[in-house]
Amino acid sequence: TRINDYEYIVLGSANLEDVSDELGLHLESDDYDTIGGYCLEKLDHLPEKNEIIITDDNILLRIEAVDKNRIEKVYIKLPRPAEEGN
């Protein structure tokens, strides 16, 4: 779900490659095919709601909903491009 040009909420079961392509990102995982799995890999534990991951590309991923051992929703905030002249 698109909130604006920089903010999205996606299902944890969403395909990682599809999310990356759709948002123009470079999220990759050797072991997982979903955005939820990607978050698990980065955190190395089952996250709680509102846990945050910052990627090397300065993309913020916040866990929006967890059900038992599954990430249900992930909030994604893309970095805004730097203003020219700053």
Describe every region a protein language model picked out.
Residues 1-86:
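Cytosolic regulatory modules rich in charged/polar residues
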